[in-house]
Swiss-Prot record:
One term of GO molecular function: enzyme regulator activity
Compositionally biased region (Low complexity): 328-343
Signal peptide region: 1-26
Gene name of the record: lpoA
UniProt organism field: Sodalis glossinidius (strain morsitans)
Name of the molecule in the record: Penicillin-binding protein activator LpoA
Record's compositionally biased regions (Polar residues): 268-281, 290-301
Residues covered by region (Disordered): 258-343
Length: 670
């Protein structure tokens, strides 16, 4: 006999999707036929068969057919119909469950809620913990509980809980002390020990989540010397020069001086446009090759293509590292800023990766006393760090901040990856749009490899955030867009799925994310966000075509990447972009206007090089916080290219600034 349980929390909340997991857990344990007290029911028929039998059956067997129908509907991707059947099932009290059933129930509830972090999912893990006997399963439960907690949206973590939920209160207090102290490892270590004393009955007090165990084992390390590995000749030279100048300016404290001057001038009500300029190249010594430190400054129309040079980034569109107890140059939000407050005496040497093989340069850097490597820049050189045995041997135990990210990442305990990639920006956009409550995004992308990469990155991040299908539409050249305008065809707000989303496994059954292959339009209430990857010229053609398709009362929100940002655009362009949100690095969105004025003049308005200069500034900050980025989960640096944090594999993520065009002005997006 098949059993059905629709369980109710004592707070009265229903979890109908949980029942689906219970159904699957029950049904997958059945043989080819499910034996009831009346007749054998085939367990692998289609949903329509079960629904028909359900209508013709008595109450004793009707529920069995209904359970199997729901299971079949889910397998067939007919989720709305499955949800209707779930809602029709009878509720019973969870107190009637025995221990094995409670374990199956809690696991089902976890499986059903994994795609969207919530307090109810945390409660499910808490309910499961005392039912587990295997030590490895207990540790996994603790780690998953913590992972869910740190992923909770702020409104969820601030909800009022029941007075008798002592274990949940302990977990929330652990989350709070982590968030309050994660920027200072020593304070965090002490706070965790105090928490363990105050909550001795909490499962995590006995066995910490793995990330917090790493915090307890944290050890800081000073930077004895830095080797900057960049291509100083060839097409990528201009990019290297921009990065090197930003790195040197941060090392010498020049960016902090600019910030101080801005604050003083702001307090006095004065402009900072007249701040003296400095090329920021002092303090680095070329080694292993010649270096043109000032470098040629090219106009936007003459510099080489970064992609052709192997540079993957947005260019295409304190004497020691701080100790655990002090973080120099902290921002107002408690995060270390992108530059220490004074010039550093750490020796820095620059090595030319275009003149010598990488193993020779790494060996030379070690002989020269370097303990930290910044670079290499080109993607093929970065891939050598783990693909080439000679390079890997030469790297030894050196800490390495690679200035690019390979296509197929192979994590290494001594390597972090920092890139200004369009994929990174797409992931940030997916999270930003999802946090604004949008449900169905449409990507407007250029045809070709760039569009493919952005589509995959956005879609992956969207699914990870709990979103469903992402739609895409491709466009061609500006000439093709103009032809669409002239012909009256414009842009149709329809799309096809980027790809099948990650399948969800519930109680041993893998359920594909349902896809809608039909045309979807905002009039049908489906598409409520459009993310556009386009140049300023292309965007000036696309935006009016979209405006013609939707009414002024439409909830359709428009977003664009930094590829579309035109800093020197006139008032007409700003008015044309009304309502559009776009992302870019903090330096280009008003974080330090005087510094931006200096750098943009230095690079003759080439904002792609300004972004690489900002990357150099942040590379210096990351070098000074390398231990924290590698060992402290959630550690952040307020950088010029974004708020910087690291994944478990030490890929540096950037949370960007978002602005919005409103009445001809740019304001911070909400």
């Amino acid at each position: 006999m098949l059993y059905s349980y629709v369980l109710v929390f004592k707070t009265g909340r229903l979890l109908p999707v949980v029942l689906a997991s219970l159904i699957l857990a029950a049904c997958t344990a059945q043989g080819p036929e499910s034996q009831t007290g009346h007749a054998a029911i085939p367990a692998n028929a289609n949903a329509d068969y079960y629904l028909q039998q359900m209508q013709q059956s008595s109450n004793d067997t009707k529920t069995d057919y209904q359970l199997l129908a729901i299971r079949a509907l889910i397998k067939e991707g007919r989720l709305p119909q499955a949800q209707q059947q779930l809602a029709a099932l009878q509720q019973i009290d969870s107190a009637s469950l025995d221990a094995p059933q409670r374990l199956r129930y809690t696991q089902a509830m976890i499986n059903a809620g994994q795609s969207r972090p919530s307090l109810d999912l945390v409660r499910a893990y808490i309910a499961q913990a005392p039912l587990l006997t295997d030590p490895a399963a207990r540790q996994q439960n603790i780690d998953k509980t913590w992972q869910t907690l740190v992923s909770l949206p702020s409104p969820q973590s601030n909800l009022v809980i029941n007075a008798d939920e002592n274990i949940l209160q302990g977990w929330l207090d652990l989350l709070r002390i982590y968030q309050d102290n994660r920027q200072d490892p020593t304070l965090l270590q002490a706070a965790i020990k105090d928490w363990q004393t105050r909550y001795p009955q909490n499962p995590a007090a006995k066995t910490l989540p793995t990330p917090l165990s790493q915090v307890q084992n944290y050890s800081s390390s000073s930077v004895g010397g830095i080797a900057l590995l960049l291509p100083l000749n060839g097409q990528a030279q201009v990019f290297s020069n921009a990065i090197q100048q930003g790195f040197s300016a941060a090392k010498n404290g020049l960016t902090t001086q600019q910030s101080a001057l801005e604050q003083d001038a702001s307090a006095a009500g004065q402009s900072t446009d007249g701040v003296p300029q400095n090329d920021g190249t002092a303090g680095t010594e070329p080694a292993g090759g010649s270096a043109n430190q000032n470098g040629p400054v090219t106009t936007p129309g003459t510099r080489p293509d970064p992609a052709a040079s192997g540079v993957d980034g947005q260019a295409s569109a304190a004497d020691n590292a701080p100790q655990a107890t002090t973080l120099s140059g902290q921002s107002a939000g408690g995060q270390p800023s992108a530059a220490p407050s004074a010039a550093s005496g750490v020796p820095v040497k620059v090595y030319d990766t275009s003149s010598q093989p990488l193993p020779a340069l790494l060996a030379q850097a070690q002989r020269d006393g370097a303990s930290m490597i910044i670079g290499p820049l080109l993607k093929n050189d970065v891939e050598q760090l783990y693909n080439d045995n000679a390079v890997a041997a030469s790297a030894g135990t050196l800490n390495i901040l690679a200035l690019n990210q390979p296509e197929h990442l192979q994590p290494r305990p001594n390597i972090c990856y920092f890139a200004l990639s369009p994929e990174d920006e797409a992931r940030d956009a997916a999270n930003h749009i999802h946090q604004q409550g949008r449900q169905q995004p449409l990507l407007l992308l250029p045809r070709g490899a760039l569009g493919d990469r952005i589509a995959k990155a956005f879609s992956d991040a969207w699914h990870q955030a709990g979103g469903a299908t992402v739609l895409e539409q491709r466009f061609g050249s500006s000439a093709e867009l103009k032809q669409n305008i002239n012909s009256g065809s414009g842009i149709s707000l329809t799309g096809t799925p980027v790809a099948a989303g990650a399948a969800v496994t519930i109680a041993g059954l893998t359920i594909p994310v349902p896809q809608d292959n039909g045309a979807v339009s905002p009039s049908g209430g489906a598409i409520d966000a459009v993310y556009i990857i386009a140049t300023p010229v292309e965007l000036a053609l696309i935006k009016p075509m979209i405006d013609m398709r939707v009414s002024s009362r439409s909830r359709l929100a428009l977003y664009a990447s930094s590829r579309s940002y035109q800093a020197d655009a006139g008032p007409d362009y700003s008015l044309e972009m009304e309502g559009l949100e776009f992302s870019d690095i903090p330096l280009l969105t008003g974080a330090h206007p005087a510094l931006l004025s200096q750098i943009s003049a230095q690079f003759r308005g080439d904002y792609s090089l300004v972004r690489l200069y900002a990357m150099g500034i942040d590379a210096w900050a990351l070098a000074n916080h390398f231990s924290e980025m590698r060992q402290i989960p959630g550690f952040q640096v307020a950088g010029e290219t974004g708020t910087l944090s690291a994944t478990p594999d030490c890929v540096i993520n950037r949370t960007l600034s978002w602005l919005k065009y409103q009445r001809g002005q740019m304001i911070a997006a909400q």
